[in-house]
Amino acid sequence: MKNVVLIGASIRLGYEKEVRELLGDDVQVFSPKENCRYTKFTLWGMFSWMESWGSPHVDLIHWNTGIWDLHRCTADGLLFTPLEEYLEVNRRLAIQMESYTKNLIWATIIPGGPALDKKMPGNSLINTDASAPKVHLTDYMEPWNADVRRYNAAATELMQSRGIRVNDLYSVIDGHLDEYISEDGIHPRPAGYSVLARKVAQEIRRALDGTES
C-alpha cells in the first residue's frame, strides 16, 4: 500500500474523487477536507493536516496552490500574493514537503476561461459605492491568464531547480477553455475535472512506479 497526499484548493477538491478511483485500492490517498486556499495558508496547514492523519509515512505528495494568490481581493486592487512572495513561500513549502518525502509533484495553475470577460464588468465584489474604485476578485481572461503563465513559469523554474516533478495542468486545459472551464470562468466543468483527474492520476502512478513522464 502506497500513501499519497493530495494538496490543493477547489480544483483539487473537484478532481480528487476520480483520482482516488483511478489510483485504485493499492494507493491510500490523504487530503484535507477543506480548501487549501492560498500558498501561505497551505504552508501553515501542512503540519496540522499531517498530524490529523496520524503523521503517516508518505510515498508521494502532489500539490498545487496559486489561484487564490492571483485574486484581487483587497481594496488596492493588487494581486493578493506578489510574485516574489509566491516564490518565497513556495520555496518554504517545497522544503516542508521534502521533509515528508522526496517524491514530489507540483502542478501548474490552470487557465481561466472566456466567462471571465462576461462577468468582470459587473463583478464589483468589495466596493459597493458607485463612486468607489471597482475591485474585482479576478480579471479579464487575457490578463488573468498572463498572470497565471507568469507565476507558473517562475514556480516551474523553482521546482525544477529542486528536482521536483512538474505536472503541467495548464496545458491540459489550455486550448479547450470553452469545453473545460465553467461559466464562473475559473472552475472546470465536469469534463474538465475528469481530464485533470486522469492527468493527475497518471503522473502520480508514473512517479510511484519510478517511470518518466
Predicted regions, residues:
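Alpha-helical cap/lid subdomain in secreted, periplasmic
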Residues: 22-25, 44-213
